């Protein structure tokens, strides 16, 4: 009897020990990955608030001490990026809205409306997703600069808009390009969502005498809000961080219409070297708009991901 009890106690103790070891291993793994992702962030923050001399003398992740602490890097970077922030926003917001809205319409037409050559058109959208930026840079530059110089044509009109200058006309071809290039991926994302919707929604609208456009506007569009949040965040991040199209269509990083991605590489660089504190401050400031967007649309983003899953 006592032998059986001791055996039972030994088994329970072994089980508890195994569970504890497993839990310790899980927590250790979580802490490792947490540190793996947070240490570079902490290093960047420490670098942003150090003087250039303190950056050279101290460890990257060590906090600044005494005169090594400064907020001048952030102030200087903000002054350098203020104009380009406005340029990036007036480029990214309409381009994102256009590509997301047109992508939703195209996905609705390819999923919930039956018509001839539907699959062939879908294949064109799929091909459009995989066309690399580099393949269209030269024809794109020739089209907007030589064949159809839209920026020069609308410059007087743009200059008459409040808060805008004539040079902001350079961003209009960039907006159109991002809309055209973003529609395929937005269409594919929305199509996967619309495929999960029951066809009875469309059939009920048809029975009530609603047209195709009215069904989209009154039925499909309202229930697509979670997916709009997902696609809007994704597309805004892609457009805001894009470099190649901006580098091709805007005259240069010194141009008054240059977005953040063109101005950022030149900040903190001089003939005497690179000021890493200023450069890191600029990098963090450049990430603020996308961070605000993620926070603002966090609920819609989570709902969209759950719906997609």
UniProtKB/Swiss-Prot annotation:
Identify the main location.
Answer: membrane
Keyword Protein transport included in the entry's annotation: no
Supply the InterPro entries for this chain: MetI-like, MetI-like_sf
Q: Where is the ABC transmembrane type-1 domain?
A: 85-297
Q: Which family does it belong to?
A: Belongs to the binding-protein-dependent transport system permease family.
PANTHER family membership: ABC TRANSPORTER PERMEASE PROTEIN, GLUCOSE IMPORT SYSTEM PERMEASE PROTEIN GLCU
Q: What is this protein called?
A: Xylose/arabinose import permease protein XacI
Name its species: Haloferax volcanii (strain ATCC 29605 / DSM 3757 / JCM 8879 / NBRC 14742 / NCIMB 2012 / VKM B-1768 / DS2) (Halobacterium volcanii)
């Amino acid at each position: 009897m006592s032998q059986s009890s001791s055996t039972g106690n030994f088994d329970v103790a072994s089980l508890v020990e195994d569970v504890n070891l497993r839990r310790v291993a899980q927590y250790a793994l979580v802490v490792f990955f947490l540190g793996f992702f947070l240490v570079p962030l902490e290093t960047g923050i420490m670098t942003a608030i150090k003087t250039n001399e303190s950056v050279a003398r101290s460890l990257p992740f060590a906090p600044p001490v005494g005169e090594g602490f400064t907020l001048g890097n952030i102030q200087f970077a903000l002054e350098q990026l203020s104009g380009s922030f406005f340029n990036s926003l007036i480029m990214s917001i309409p381009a994102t809205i256009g590509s997301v809205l047109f992508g939703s319409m195209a996905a609705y037409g390819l999923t919930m409306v039956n018509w001839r050559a539907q699959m062939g058109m879908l294949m064109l959208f799929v091909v459009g997703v995989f066309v690399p930026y580099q393949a269209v840079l030269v024809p794109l530059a020739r089209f907007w600069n030589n064949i159809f110089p839209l920026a020069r044509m609308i410059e007087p009109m743009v200059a008459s808009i409040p808060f805008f200058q004539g040079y902001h006309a350079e961003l209009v071809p960039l907006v159109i390009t991002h809309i055209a290039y973003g529609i395929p991926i937005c269409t594919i994302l929305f199509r996967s969502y619309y495929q999960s919707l029951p066809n009875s929604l469309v059939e009920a609208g048809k029975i009530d005498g609603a047209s195709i456009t009215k069904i989209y506007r009154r039925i499909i569009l309202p229930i697509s809000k979670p997916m709009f949040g997902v696609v809007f965040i994704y597309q805004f991040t892609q457009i805001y961080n894009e470099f190649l199209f901006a580098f091709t269509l805007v005259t240069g990083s010194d141009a008054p219409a240059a977005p953040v991605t063109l101005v950022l590489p030149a900040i903190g660089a001089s003939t005497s070297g690179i000021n890493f504190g200023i450069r890191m401050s600029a990098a963090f400031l450049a990430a603020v708009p996308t961070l605000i967007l993620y926070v603002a649309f966090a609920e819609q983003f989570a709902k969209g991901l759950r719906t997609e899953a």
